[in-house]
């Protein structure tokens, strides 16, 4: 057991971590390794604009057979970092937000496109879209990147 507080009411909340049987299978049987950028292609790398493509593989699916949300988020986060690099700076994710709009499926061809909409000295704001081969938007994400140094230094 672990105690934590909710942010709004400061009431203690108990968290219990234990293996739960679901349909006769332990929860650990539902967990598996997720692969990201196993087969990516850099399509565009310009100042403030990056496009990477990849294919959804079996190792990137969730239990329901769709592209795992963590997989999609990681694709966005990696591209946001590449966008920061494209502006000449090293940066780390300071804050992020993602909206999942449609499911990705096995063998979908994904385009991950990042665009720097604010190129500041200490922070950058990067918008990232993931679209499929039908040009349907799967995710829309925003990343605030904190600049840790210049590539030229």
Regions found by a protein language model. Name each.
Residues 2-5, 9:
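Intrinsic-disorder-associated, low-complexity terminal segments enriched in Asp/Asn/His/Tyr and depleted
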Residues 5, 14-153:
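Terminal targeting signals and extreme-terminal segments of soluble enzymes
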């Amino acid at each position: 057991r672990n105690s934590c507080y909710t942010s709004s009411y400061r009431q203690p909340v108990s968290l219990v971590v234990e293996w739960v049987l679901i349909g006769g299978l332990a929860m650990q049987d539902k967990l598996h390794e997720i692969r990201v950028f196993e087969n990516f292609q850099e399509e565009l790398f310009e100042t403030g604009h990056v496009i990477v493509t990849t294919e959804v593989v079996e190792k990137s699916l969730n239990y329901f057979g769709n592209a795992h949300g963590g997989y999609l988020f990681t694709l966005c986060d990696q591209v946001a970092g590449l966008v920061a690099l494209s502006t000449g700076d090293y940066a780390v994710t300071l804050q992020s937000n993602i909206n999942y709009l449609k499911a990705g499926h096995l063998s979908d061809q994904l385009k991950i496109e990042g665009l720097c909409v604010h190129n500041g000295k200490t922070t950058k704001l990067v918008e990232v879209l993931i679209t499929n081969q039908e040009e349907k938007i799967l995710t829309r994400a925003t990343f605030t990147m904190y600049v840790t140094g210049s590539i030229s230094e």
